[in-house]
Amino acid sequence: RAAGHTVTGCDQNVYPPMSTQLEALGIELIEGFEAGQLERVQPDIFVVGNVVKRGMPLMEAILDRGLPYTSGPQWLAENVLAGRWVLAVAGTHGKTTTSSMLAWILEANGLAPGFLIGGIPENFAVSARLPGEPAQEPGGESPFFVIEADEYDTAFFDKRSKFVHYHPRTAILNNLEFDHADIFADLPAIETQFHHLVRTVPGTGRLVVNGREASLARVLERGCWTPVETFAAPAGSGWQAGEADDDGHFDVLLDGDTVGRVRWNLMGEHNRLNAVAAVAAARHAGVRPQDACAALAMFANVKRRMEVKGSVNGVTVYDDFAHHPTAIATTVAGLRARVGTARILAVLEPRSNTMKLGTMKAELPASLAQADRVFGYQGGLGWDLAAALAPLGDKAQSFGDLDALVAAVVAEAQPGDQVLVMSNGGFGGVHGKLLAALA
């Protein structure tokens, strides 16, 4: 739309913050995938998301009529990313946060990047924009574009990972473990897709790679033609995040030398490592590490990443996108580090495709171990959540009814408690229901 096009979209089960962002931008959203939409709109092209499948009436009508269509990643590559310096952030976890940090670092240093991020960074209030006018080049246009690089498949007609379309000059490989069990058979299958991404980065580009990850080491062993900078390597070389002080501030080190200090209040080692990766990638784009660290002092996290939704009668309710056991464990640990001995009431909806398959249900108890109480939502699962949470004993409960879950949380909550809601969906508006019931 910023490029001058009229944009109309269709989807189902759209929820905030994306639904409210579309409304604020004046972009019409049609609910569902019925063929009758073609009588209302006659687009020049249909950009097909990977949620669309054969058999959906709208897609069948598009094919029957021979109407032009493409995938989202392909459209981006041809119409937005072509000719630009693309900085891509890939990995199982932390893509949205790290992309937001990187975009903000470039913005704060006058580089006016474009970006496409799978969340809404608070510093920008939108999830995407075209490049702007750099401070150093009045009247010009920034060459930089930051993109969250997802390994999920592109579309029903293109089963490659989305990120192979993006052709980055700078790429962060943040971490890599098994996920997306609905489309990948095992971890080696995902490693192959990351290898394909590495193949697209030019020899004059840069790879910023988590040095702790054996899976990423295997990816690079299959072939790498680009200079590599590591972060978090066990030997202490490359980029490192120092220990955080009581305020959450920490030093950024490169080959043992302190090159900057980040002064913020974000919690958790995972965010320190996200920051170091962003600082390293920004340096490749010309930003000095000390300037990147200074920018992060003004970084506001992404919506749905430990976002405080409200506090009522001494009970604080958080919203977080965590849905993979590793992300759940990291989120709970981060909150524990912040709140000390305060009780954490974890409220979980395992609704990702991987979790719906039950592939990682055995890992849930360990991921929730640091919570004082656990309230799980059974809705939509084909496996027994209560049985999966049984190793947690009496501190865990499972509910098939959302109102019953809310009532149980409210009955348990005491002043000083921290209610941590984790889901990658709308969760039936549970945050608002909790806050209303707590009042």
Question: Where do the model's predicted regions map?
Answer:
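ATP-dependent carboxylate-amine ligase
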Residues: 1-18, 22-30, 42-46, 67, ...
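Conserved RecA-like helicase motor-core motifs
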Residues: 10, 110-117, 231, 397
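Short, polar loop motifs at secondary-structure junctions
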Residues: 12-15, 33-35, 50-53, 74, ...
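Phosphate-binding loop of NTP-binding sites
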Residues: 23, 37-38, 50-211, 215-226, ...
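Short loop/edge segments at beta-strand edges and connector loops
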Residues: 31-33, 71-73, 117-119, 209-211, ...
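Short, ordered beta-strand-loop transition motifs
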Residues: 134, 138, 242-248, 311-312
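Acidic-glycine-rich active-site phosphate/pyrophosphate-binding loop
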Residues: 145, 241-260
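Histidine-centered acyl-transfer/condensation active-site motif
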Residues: 263-264
